[in-house]
Regions:
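N-terminal Sec/ER secretory leader and immediately downstream segment
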Residues: 1-48
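Residue-level signature of catalytic and energy-coupling elements of molecular machines
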Residues: 2, 72, 167
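Extracytoplasmic
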Residues: 13-17, 44, 74, 147-150, ...
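Mid-length scaffold segments of soluble, non-membrane domains
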Residues: 38-110
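Pore-lining and gate-forming transmembrane alpha-helices of multi-pass membrane transport proteins
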Residues: 93, 97, 134, 138-142, ...
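An amphipathic alpha-helical core segment
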Residues: 106-147
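A cross-kingdom marker for long, charged
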Residues: 148-183
Length: 183
């Protein structure tokens, strides 16, 4: 459910829980650019970052299904008896690294297609000139990939909380979709 929600147009961009904003080091520069009438450039950059994440997310489904298929009885008991996000933590431990490896090339291709790296570097360059950003900022591709991964697990956690609060209503609908995907 989380993957389907995030993988559609606006899945990240229109969801305040997972929307990918500019890196913290660029927030001040973005605000200054908005003040100077350059808000459209900032918005275009943020939109492109979120679209790149939306394109990568469908790759998560096979990894999440694989994690469920490989779940041992011990794992299942730990998830059932664990806290409100025990399943999310199980998925994070089992899938974050391989998911990141699948996301990164897609994010990289998406950012190159829309010249995101150049847009980011233009804003980062202006921020650097103003002393608002150091040279050590991460690559935009890795930043977007990490935020995309965070978004997947945030949405899984939200679904898990709903299931634990209403296991009959919400849980049966989601379990049907999960086990339907296992076929």
């Amino acid at each position: 459910v989380a993957v389907d929600t995030l993988g559609r147009d606006g899945g990240y961009l229109n969801n305040p829980l997972v929307r990918i904003a500019l890196p913290e080091g660029l927030q001040q520069a973005a605000q200054l650019m908005r003040t100077l009438g350059q808000g459209a450039r900032v918005d275009a950059l943020e939109t492109a970052m979120n679209r790149a994440a939306e394109q990568a997310v469908p790759q998560a489904k096979s990894l999440l299904v694989g994690a469920v298929k490989s779940m041992s009885v011990k794992d299942a008991l730990q998830v059932l008896q664990g806290g409100e996000t025990a399943a999310t933590e199980f998925f994070r431990e089992r899938t974050r690294t391989p998911m990141g490896e699948k996301f990164l090339p897609i994010v990289t291709a998406a950012t190159q297609k829309v010249s995101l790296a150049q847009k980011y570097n233009a804003i980062a360059g202006q921020a650097q000139k103003l002393g608002l950003l150091g040279e050590q900022h991460a690559s935009i591709e890795r930043y977007v990939t990490e935020r995309a991964l965070d978004g997947v697990y945030t949405m899984i956690a939200e679904e898990e909380k709903k299931i634990r609060q209403d296991p009959i209503g919400t849980g049966s609908r989601i379990l049907r979709s999960v086990f339907g995907a296992l076929k």
